[in-house]
């Protein structure tokens, strides 16, 4: 695929929400490799699924020979982006933000190639140019190029200005200037010609384009990817437990894999275009195959495999599939201690218990049963398994052999109701 066709390919995948001067950008891409960047503010100690589409777009550009720059906002993370936010963000300490910067840089690194010649990726931090800038320099060299009239008319902040209960502080109002200067600065340092980001960043991106033109007389471009929505109108990237994170300590590979397995049929083929590198033709063929097979669609498993491998590598995918298979067939012999740690983290409901507890008490404490009386009936009806083995004795008390790796016992009621006991 020719680099000049990259915008068209992104559009075919539904990955372009807005683009500035599409024709001129296509011409610029046709002339040869460019440098581009995407910013990631450290608003938490991990990126989440919402960051994955722009991050993978950086990867798509690099695979076509372009030079990606992942900018982690050590400075902008101290301020907070007000774009489309209903209320002022809580300001975090410098130490906290720096810790998050380090974590996010490490998280971004595996997606890009930092050692591949001329288009090797760069990791940047905007604290490098803002950290020692004084307020007079900021106001004279940056502020004078921004019209407050235009800033208050940007959709991203207009909503806040129009709310009686929530105004906007000067701190957050200034964010637009900071991100705008990032673009101008990266244009000067690395010849960056394109910024990509989520569609909520459009106002910040266009500010950067204007500022770069004013400061350096260079034409640069902006491209936004859509904010991902689900066909049923519910928010993408959320589970009952909250956001789906890229950090395995916050969302285990098993839970991550299950998130994709549970994708609705109405969303799955679109998500294959957004989150994987499968060819459009392959995705269309898979959709056709699923329609005509008369069986459960295969697409969810393809999606879960590809995205889990991208984020958690081969080992993470193997563990997720191993845990999934073990829970499905009821045999736990293949599970490692690390697999049980994933289950305890967020895979199934978990309860901590003292040794000496009996089965009835475990069912009540785990909320698999409402009372000891009901637990007794359920056990007697042969509906309970301990580590995959049926147990029909209501008076059963756990023994050391039930404690896998000396710590874990998996209870199941019926076919799908699990609880993991972690013994104290």
Swiss-Prot record:
Motif ('KMSKS' region): 235-239
SMART domains associated with the record: S4
A Pfam family reported for this protein in Swiss-Prot or TrEMBL: SYY_C-terminal
GO annotation, cellular component aspect: cytosol
Its EC number(s): 6.1.1.1
Residues where ATP binds: 238
Keywords: Aminoacyl-tRNA synthetase, ATP-binding, Cytoplasm, Ligase, Nucleotide-binding, Protein biosynthesis, RNA-binding
Subcellular location, principal: cytoplasm
Motif ('HIGH' region): 42-51
Domain of life: Bacteria
Catalysed reaction, written as an equation: tRNA(Tyr) + L-tyrosine + ATP = L-tyrosyl-tRNA(Tyr) + AMP + diphosphate + H(+)
Matching PROSITE patterns: AA_TRNA_LIGASE_I, S4
PANTHER family xref list: TYROSINE--TRNA LIGASE, MITOCHONDRIAL, TYROSYL-TRNA SYNTHETASE
Family: Belongs to the class-I aminoacyl-tRNA synthetase family. TyrS type 1 subfamily.
Role of this protein: Catalyzes the attachment of tyrosine to tRNA(Tyr) in a two-step reaction: tyrosine is first activated by ATP to form Tyr-AMP and then transferred to the acceptor end of tRNA(Tyr).
Subunit comment: Homodimer.
Protein name (Swiss-Prot/TrEMBL): Tyrosine--tRNA ligase
Organism expressing this protein natively: Enterobacter sp. (strain 638)
Gene name linked to the record: tyrS
